[in-house]
UniProtKB/Swiss-Prot annotation:
Belongs to the methyltransferase superfamily. L-isoaspartyl/D-aspartyl protein methyltransferase family. It is an enzyme of class 2 (transferase). Its EC number is 2.1.1.77. PROSITE patterns: PCMT. One of its GO terms (biological process) is methylation. It comes from Escherichia fergusonii (strain ATCC 35469 / DSM 13698 / CCUG 18766 / IAM 14443 / JCM 21226 / LMG 7866 / NBRC 102419 / NCTC 12128 / CDC 0568-73). This is Protein-L-isoaspartate O-methyltransferase. Its main location: cytoplasm. GO terms for molecular function: protein-L-isoaspartate (D-aspartate) O-methyltransferase activity. It catalyses: [protein]-L-isoaspartate + S-adenosyl-L-methionine = [protein]-L-isoaspartate alpha-methyl ester + S-adenosyl-L-homocysteine. PANTHER family: PROTEIN-L-ISOASPARTATE O-METHYLTRANSFERASE, PROTEIN-L-ISOASPARTATE(D-ASPARTATE) O-METHYLTRANSFERASE.
Amino acid sequence: MVSRRVQALLDQLRAQGIKDEQVLNALAAVPREKFIDEAFEQKAWDNIALPIGQGQTISQPYMVARMTELLELTPQSRVLEIGTGSGYQTAILAHLVQHVCSVERIKGLQWQARRRLKNLDLHNVSTRHGDGWQGWQARAPFDAIIVTAAPPEIPTALMTQLDEGGILVLPVGEEHQYLKRVRRRGGEFIIDTVEAVRFVPLVKGELA
């Protein structure tokens, strides 16, 4: 039994076109208020992005659901997340697959996310402090890669770390950004443009 606030959000997401009930169930299961500052707790279940510090944000639930749905996950999917951030998207993924790999360039955010995930008994996540542009070659290939910040172009390293049939979902662009889905098929990459979006930039390098 979910609260009225959670149910209202789920109804709104369905109205916005989210159809995957597994994704919606994952959103209902993850307490978004645990991933934001207490000052914003009353807005935790609003369908909006919220600041998490370090110039980063927690994405609006619609965008989390949309991007997750586009990955076409199964429980066996090998998943890489670029931009752990608050750990909220990571937690959604952890409810849907057996294991999640996640890379975060800001050390402080990585440690906060690890603590939150542990507190929620989500132990099927491996996090790494590093440059998201480079992916996680040692754990490749992946069936699904999700990027939660926008590079000006699709990073080559992420495309090459996709397994055959794998899907990469990410925002791309600077002033004007679009959500893209890249599917690796037969040695080729099929790129579809999904919709206009607004994300923080995917910065190269890493911060201590």
